Amino acid sequence: MTIVGLARNLVGDGRLHAARWVLRLRIRLRHPTLFSDPTAIWDYGYSDIDAISLGERVWVGAFAEVIVQRHARYSRVEGRLRLEDGVVISTGVNLRAAGGAIQVGAGSVISQHCVVVAANHKLEPGIARIHTPWDETRCGVEIGANVWIGAGSVVLPGARIGDNAVIAAGSVVRGEVPAGELWGGVPARYIKTIE
Protein backbone atom coordinates (compact mmCIF):
# COMPACT_ATOMS: atom_id res chain seq x y z
CA MET A 1 0.00 0.00 0.00
CA THR A 2 1.26 3.48 -0.84
CA ILE A 3 1.67 6.18 1.78
CA VAL A 4 -1.23 8.16 0.28
CA GLY A 5 -3.37 5.00 0.32
CA LEU A 6 -2.49 4.43 3.96
CA ALA A 7 -3.39 8.04 4.76
CA ARG A 8 -6.78 7.65 3.04
CA ASN A 9 -7.50 4.49 5.02
CA LEU A 10 -6.58 6.18 8.28
CA VAL A 11 -8.83 9.13 7.48
CA GLY A 12 -11.66 6.74 6.60
CA ASP A 13 -11.22 5.05 9.97
CA GLY A 14 -11.35 8.39 11.76
CA ARG A 15 -7.69 8.33 12.73
CA LEU A 16 -6.98 11.85 11.50
CA HIS A 17 -3.89 12.39 13.65
CA ALA A 18 -2.23 9.26 12.26
CA ALA A 19 -3.09 10.30 8.70
CA ARG A 20 -1.46 13.69 9.20
CA TRP A 21 1.62 11.97 10.56
CA VAL A 22 1.82 9.73 7.47
CA LEU A 23 1.49 12.73 5.13
CA ARG A 24 4.12 14.66 7.04
CA LEU A 25 6.44 11.65 6.70
CA ARG A 26 5.81 11.46 2.94
CA ILE A 27 6.54 15.16 2.50
CA ARG A 28 9.76 14.85 4.53
CA LEU A 29 10.89 11.83 2.50
CA ARG A 30 10.23 13.56 -0.82
CA HIS A 31 11.56 17.01 0.10
CA PRO A 32 14.49 18.08 2.32
CA THR A 33 12.26 20.41 4.32
CA LEU A 34 12.14 21.26 8.00
CA PHE A 35 8.68 21.39 9.56
CA SER A 36 8.55 22.55 13.17
CA ASP A 37 5.99 20.93 15.46
CA PRO A 38 3.10 21.52 15.61
CA THR A 39 2.38 22.45 12.00
CA ALA A 40 -0.90 21.70 10.23
CA ILE A 41 0.07 20.59 6.75
CA TRP A 42 -3.36 19.59 5.58
CA ASP A 43 -6.92 20.47 6.29
CA TYR A 44 -9.19 19.56 3.37
CA GLY A 45 -8.10 16.21 2.09
CA TYR A 46 -5.33 13.73 1.75
CA SER A 47 -5.23 13.11 -1.98
CA ASP A 48 -3.80 16.48 -3.07
CA ILE A 49 -0.23 16.03 -1.87
CA ASP A 50 1.05 16.19 -5.45
CA ALA A 51 -0.29 19.75 -5.66
CA ILE A 52 2.59 20.76 -3.34
CA SER A 53 6.04 21.47 -4.77
CA LEU A 54 8.83 22.18 -2.29
CA GLY A 55 12.38 23.20 -3.09
CA GLU A 56 15.42 22.40 -0.96
CA ARG A 57 15.99 23.94 2.49
CA VAL A 58 12.39 25.14 2.87
CA TRP A 59 11.55 25.86 6.51
CA VAL A 60 8.00 25.93 7.88
CA GLY A 61 7.64 27.26 11.43
CA ALA A 62 5.57 26.00 14.33
CA PHE A 63 1.81 26.62 14.27
CA ALA A 64 1.85 27.36 10.53
CA GLU A 65 -1.22 26.18 8.65
CA VAL A 66 -0.64 25.07 5.07
CA ILE A 67 -3.84 24.29 3.17
CA VAL A 68 -3.74 23.01 -0.40
CA GLN A 69 -6.91 21.88 -2.12
CA ARG A 70 -6.46 21.01 -5.77
CA HIS A 71 -10.20 20.85 -6.58
CA ALA A 72 -12.13 23.27 -4.39
CA ARG A 73 -15.89 22.91 -4.14
CA TYR A 74 -16.75 26.36 -5.49
CA SER A 75 -13.95 26.89 -8.04
CA ARG A 76 -12.75 25.38 -11.29
CA VAL A 77 -9.23 26.79 -10.74
CA GLU A 78 -6.71 24.28 -9.37
CA GLY A 79 -5.17 24.95 -6.00
CA ARG A 80 -1.39 24.46 -5.96
CA LEU A 81 1.51 25.49 -3.71
CA ARG A 82 5.09 25.98 -4.88
CA LEU A 83 7.80 26.99 -2.40
CA GLU A 84 11.19 27.34 -4.10
CA ASP A 85 14.64 26.76 -2.54
CA GLY A 86 15.36 28.44 0.78
CA VAL A 87 11.85 29.78 1.43
CA VAL A 88 11.04 30.51 5.09
CA ILE A 89 7.44 30.26 6.29
CA SER A 90 7.55 31.63 9.85
CA THR A 91 5.58 30.78 12.97
CA GLY A 92 1.80 31.04 12.69
CA VAL A 93 1.68 31.75 8.95
CA ASN A 94 -1.52 30.72 7.16
CA LEU A 95 -1.15 29.68 3.49
CA ARG A 96 -4.44 28.86 1.70
CA ALA A 97 -3.89 27.48 -1.80
CA ALA A 98 -7.45 26.48 -2.67
CA GLY A 99 -9.18 27.91 -5.73
CA GLY A 100 -5.85 29.30 -6.94
CA ALA A 101 -2.10 28.76 -6.84
CA ILE A 102 0.46 30.27 -4.47
CA GLN A 103 4.04 30.52 -5.72
CA VAL A 104 6.87 31.79 -3.51
CA GLY A 105 10.28 32.45 -5.11
CA ALA A 106 13.67 31.30 -3.84
CA GLY A 107 14.99 32.86 -0.64
CA SER A 108 11.77 34.66 0.25
CA VAL A 109 10.60 35.07 3.85
CA ILE A 110 6.98 35.20 4.97
CA SER A 111 7.22 36.49 8.53
CA GLN A 112 5.23 35.55 11.62
CA HIS A 113 1.43 35.44 11.50
CA CYS A 114 1.03 36.45 7.85
CA VAL A 115 -1.91 35.22 5.79
CA VAL A 116 -1.61 34.42 2.07
CA VAL A 117 -4.91 33.56 0.37
CA ALA A 118 -5.13 32.33 -3.24
CA ALA A 119 -8.89 32.84 -3.74
CA ASN A 120 -11.95 34.37 -2.18
CA HIS A 121 -15.71 34.11 -2.60
CA LYS A 122 -17.59 36.45 -4.96
CA LEU A 123 -19.94 39.01 -3.47
CA GLU A 124 -23.43 38.01 -4.60
CA PRO A 125 -26.52 39.41 -2.89
CA GLY A 126 -28.97 36.99 -1.33
CA ILE A 127 -26.61 34.01 -1.17
CA ALA A 128 -24.86 32.89 2.00
CA ARG A 129 -21.25 34.03 1.58
CA ILE A 130 -19.83 30.61 2.31
CA HIS A 131 -21.85 29.11 -0.58
CA THR A 132 -21.02 31.65 -3.30
CA PRO A 133 -18.63 30.57 -6.06
CA TRP A 134 -15.05 31.74 -5.79
CA ASP A 135 -13.88 34.72 -7.79
CA GLU A 136 -11.98 33.11 -10.65
CA THR A 137 -11.09 36.46 -12.25
CA ARG A 138 -8.81 37.41 -9.36
CA CYS A 139 -7.07 34.38 -7.94
CA GLY A 140 -3.60 33.09 -7.27
CA VAL A 141 -0.64 34.79 -5.61
CA GLU A 142 2.89 35.18 -7.02
CA ILE A 143 5.69 36.19 -4.66
CA GLY A 144 9.05 36.69 -6.35
CA ALA A 145 12.55 35.70 -5.23
CA ASN A 146 14.21 37.28 -2.17
CA VAL A 147 10.99 38.96 -1.01
CA TRP A 148 10.44 39.82 2.65
CA ILE A 149 6.84 40.02 3.84
CA GLY A 150 6.70 41.66 7.28
CA ALA A 151 4.93 40.12 10.27
CA GLY A 152 1.14 40.18 10.35
CA SER A 153 0.70 41.11 6.70
CA VAL A 154 -2.12 39.80 4.51
CA VAL A 155 -1.57 38.98 0.83
CA LEU A 156 -4.89 38.87 -1.05
CA PRO A 157 -5.90 36.89 -4.16
CA GLY A 158 -4.47 38.28 -7.38
CA ALA A 159 -1.42 39.86 -5.70
CA ARG A 160 1.89 39.84 -7.58
CA ILE A 161 5.02 40.83 -5.64
CA GLY A 162 8.21 41.34 -7.65
CA ASP A 163 11.70 40.07 -6.83
CA ASN A 164 13.58 41.78 -3.97
CA ALA A 165 10.48 43.67 -2.76
CA VAL A 166 9.76 44.27 0.93
CA ILE A 167 6.30 44.50 2.48
CA ALA A 168 6.13 46.40 5.79
CA ALA A 169 4.66 44.64 8.83
CA GLY A 170 0.88 44.70 9.13
CA SER A 171 0.23 45.55 5.48
CA VAL A 172 -2.58 44.35 3.21
CA VAL A 173 -1.29 43.60 -0.29
CA ARG A 174 -3.56 43.53 -3.32
CA GLY A 175 -2.61 44.05 -6.93
CA GLU A 176 0.96 44.42 -8.13
CA VAL A 177 4.08 45.38 -6.18
CA PRO A 178 7.03 46.06 -8.53
CA ALA A 179 10.44 44.48 -7.98
CA GLY A 180 12.85 46.20 -5.60
CA GLU A 181 10.32 48.43 -3.83
CA LEU A 182 9.20 48.85 -0.22
CA TRP A 183 5.42 48.93 0.22
CA GLY A 184 3.34 49.23 3.38
CA GLY A 185 -0.03 50.16 4.83
CA VAL A 186 -3.67 49.19 4.46
CA PRO A 187 -3.96 48.86 1.55
CA ALA A 188 -0.22 48.63 0.83
CA ARG A 189 1.21 51.61 -1.06
CA TYR A 190 4.61 52.54 -2.47
CA ILE A 191 7.02 53.89 0.16
CA LYS A 192 10.40 53.89 -1.58
CA THR A 193 12.72 52.11 -3.97
CA ILE A 194 15.24 49.83 -2.30
CA GLU A 195 18.77 50.75 -3.35
Residue map of PLM features:
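Domain-scale signature associated with acetyltransferase and cell-envelope carbohydrate enzymes
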Residues: 1-118, 141-145, 153, 163, ...
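Short, flexible, mixed-charge acidic loops at enzyme active sites
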Residues: 55, 84, 122-131
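Conserved catalytic-core motifs of eukaryotic protein kinase domains, centered on the activation segment
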Residues: 120-122, 127-128, 159, 193-194
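A short acidic, glycine-rich active-site loop
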Residues: 130-141
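Conserved coupling/switch loop of ABC ATPases
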Residues: 97, 157, 175
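A generic "structured core" feature
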Residues: 148, 154-172
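Residue-level signal for alpha-helical context at structural boundaries
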Residues: 126, 183-184
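Alpha-helix boundary/capping detector
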Residues: 113, 119-121, 134, 169, ...
